[in-house]
Design a protein with these regions (language model features):
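Short amphipathic, positively biased membrane-proximal segments
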Residues: 1-183
Length: 184
């Protein structure tokens, strides 16, 4: 019995959903690597490429963006294609990619650490922690301003790194997940 196209799509969507869900669970169970995190490695490669390629022009900026994101789309598409008839492998690769790009657990840890410092009135520690969350100069900020900066940054990062990445993963699969995080 062959699988109908409609059933094939349904299985693919179920695998995608399962992979995204398992990736979120893995994000909270499996700690981020201390060195060579996939997002950091990609960011470092983009920074190196930016020094040689980017210029302040629409054409060069477009070329730079396409050069950075096309490999992610190609890799994501190839993995999706190669795992099309292997549901367990598709779930596993989607879960692995989701774990790599969704930073909700590390963001939550940073937020809890900041909340602890502020609750204990430890402004020195809170000021040291703030650059982990945002680019504000913490030395001139009081406790309320540090809290506001932390909350604003956590909300923005939760939207960018977790919610939007998962949305693109749900809508466009592995290529969407990878390209969104790469662009972000």
């Amino acid at each position: 019995m062959s699988i109908t196209p409609r059933r094939h799509v349904a299985v693919g969507l179920l695998c995608r959903a399962a992979g995204l869900g398992l990736g979120i669970i893995a994000d909270h169970i499996v700690p981020d690597p201390q060195t060579h995190h996939p997002v950091a490695v990609f960011g470092a490669a983009v920074a190196r490429l930016e020094k040689t390629m980017y210029a302040d022009s629409t054409r060069r900026g477009t070329l730079f963006t396409v050069t950075c994101l096309t490999p992610l789309a190609v890799i994501g598409g190839a993995v999706d294609r190669l795992t099309r008839n292997r549901p367990a492998l598709r779930i596993a690769t989607t879960a692995l990619a989701t774990w790599a790009v969704v930073g909700s657990a590390s963001l939550a840890r940073e937020g809890r650490a900041m909340a602890g410092h502020l609750a204990n009135g430890d402004l020195v520690a809170a000021r040291k922690r703030l650059p982990h969350l945002c680019g504000r100069d913490p030395d001139a900020l009081d406790a309320a301003e540090i809290a506001r900066g932390a909350v604003e940054s956590m909300a923005e990062n939760a939207s960018d790194a977790a919610v939007a990445s998962l949305w693109w993963g749900a809508v466009a699969g592995l290529p969407g997940l990878l390209v969104h995080r790469g662009a972000n």
